[in-house]
Amino acid sequence: MFLGEYQHSLDEKGRITIPAKFREEIGYKFVATKGLDNCIFLYPQDEWQLIEKKLRSLPFTRADVRSFVRFFFSGAAELDLDRQGRSVLPLNLREYAGIDRDVIIIGVGTRVEIWSTEKWTDYNENAQSSYEEIAENLVDLGI
């Protein structure tokens, strides 16, 4: 399970260092794609295969399904970790997430998210102010 929040910076080659605590679980080959809220999602291969299977089972005759699947898969890239735990983030994903240099890497259970520091700060401030309200709404989902 991926947990925690880490501050990192991209190097001049666009490489990011994956936190040591995440490396074993994410593996040396993993998938990055456009996430929700303008961040980047990273998935271990096994989790990616589960998501891929679920998305393939959706009815492609629905326009919203086609749009989501196109966006999600077209932005995806299979990435590798080098011996130092670094991986090059593709330019299209960096541009999508507004990442120049400084990033926040967070663990979100089954995936890792990479945020520009600025966007994470803004998101986090807004989420903190409504955290209790969100928690109350989750009761409806049985949580």
UniProtKB/Swiss-Prot annotation:
Its main location: cytoplasm. The keyword DNA-binding applies. Keywords: Cytoplasm, DNA-binding, Repeat, Transcription, Transcription regulation. GO terms for molecular function: DNA-binding transcription factor activity; transcription cis-regulatory region binding. Pfam families: MraZ (PF02381). Signal peptide: none annotated. It comes from the Bacteria. Coiled coil: none annotated. CDD domains: MraZ_C, MraZ_N. GO terms for biological process: negative regulation of DNA-templated transcription initiation. Residues 5-47, 76-119 form the SpoVT-AbrB domain. One of its GO terms (cellular component) is nucleoid. PANTHER family: TRANSCRIPTIONAL REGULATOR MRAZ. Forms oligomers. Belongs to the MraZ family. This is Transcriptional regulator MraZ. It comes from Syntrophomonas wolfei subsp. wolfei (strain DSM 2245B / Goettingen). The lineage of its organism: Bacteria, Bacillati, Bacillota, Clostridia, Eubacteriales. The gene is mraZ.
